[in-house]
A protein has these predicted regions:
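Intrinsically disordered, low-complexity, charge-dense segments enriched in Lys/Arg
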Residues: 107, 111-188
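Basic helix-turn-helix/winged-helix DNA-binding cores
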Residues: 2-109
Length: 188
């Protein structure tokens, strides 16, 4: 199968549209009551609907618990703090090892609450994503006095969102090729 070498304006529009209106629920908006495993997976995946490769499965959650990256559920229910951690893990797992994710969690716990860290993470994702997806022409700079945790978080988010962008581009290119098989190659 042959692919065109560049994205046309319609493909770019579709990729940019993935980022339009994207937002993550803030800590206070996450359910205060515990969720069972399937509900947890469904909620986390709903945050990234439309982004290929950014997903969570029940076996992944079990693996994160087994490796100690997140704590064990209480009576088979996952808490607000665990949901926030899983949302972060789902975004960063394609660019960081579980060991590095766990290191960042430990750094965060030493400096702020789970709610503060998660809400800052949401702000940073919503700052970086539109810029990388070319839906915004600017990105808010990090405070020059930002601590190491914030710098590492920004680096993680930029890497993860760039991966999301590339995945969306390749999906759009494949969809375009599927719509017009053979014709696109003949036009070159």
């Amino acid at each position: 199968m042959r692919y065109t070498t560049s994205m046309d304006q319609e493909m770019k529009r579709r990729v940019t549209a993935c980022a339009a209106g994207f937002s993550l629920p803030r800590y206070r908006e996450l359910p205060a009551v515990g969720l069972y495993l399937d509900q947890t997976v469904q909620l986390v995946n709903s945050c990234f609907r439309g982004f290929p490769g950014v997903e969570l499965t029940p076996s992944m959650v079990s693996n994160y618990v087994k490796k100690g990256v997140i704590s064990h559920p209480v009576k088979k229910k996952y808490s607000r703090e665990q949901l926030a951690s899983l949302i972060y893990i789902v975004l960063s797992k394609n660019v960081l090892s579980l060991e590095n994710i766990d290191t960042l969690f430990q750094m965060q716990r030493a400096h702020c609450t789970a709610a503060e860290a998660y809400d800052y993470f949401c702000d940073e994702v919503e700052n970086c994503l539109p810029f990388i997806f070319e839906a915004s022409s600017s990105i808010r700079d990090l405070d020059p006095d930002a601590n190491d945790e914030k710098r590492l978080l920004r680096g993680t988010i930029v890497a993860a969102v760039n991966k999301m962008y590339l995945d969306c581009c390749f999906v759009a290119m494949r969809q375009e090729q599927a719509l017009w098989p053979g014709i696109l190659g003949d036009l070159e």
